[in-house]
Amino acid sequence: MKIVKNMTHIIDYQATQPISKTGETTFAIPSSPNKANLKLRISSRDSRNNRVELIATIGVEGITGTSQVLFRIFRDNIEVFNAQVGIESTDSEQFYVQTFQAIDQNVSSGTHEYSLTVENLTSGASAEVVGPLSFSALAIGKEQKCC
């Protein structure tokens, strides 16, 4: 009788937090097709039965109008996730903290670069990243062990 065990293990973990508090550092969200970009490198050993869990938190402020802000995550310049959010400005809900999670599955072996980008899709409206800003990637593998 064979007993097969599925073993989950951490392959790699990387994180960056360039802005830890609201207002610590701010920058305008560029109008599309330009983007603000934050990058991480993460290793993945086995191309079968693995995944990379990505988590981003971004504090934004509406400056003028209502901005449609697009957040994207790329692996090696290939988009693997996106989310769009409406950001209002003065006389409304002006500050937002967006947190989202993406799961990239069956990633090929090797080291990969993940990029988090943000861009404003609405001309005539403006928004800023005001913090906090963090981006993390956790590579998880699953092995099958026998007997």
Residue ranges and their predicted role:
Residues 1-53, 61-66, 133-147:
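Terminal (often C-terminal
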Residues 57-111, 117-147:
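Terminal beta-strand-rich extracellular "head" domains
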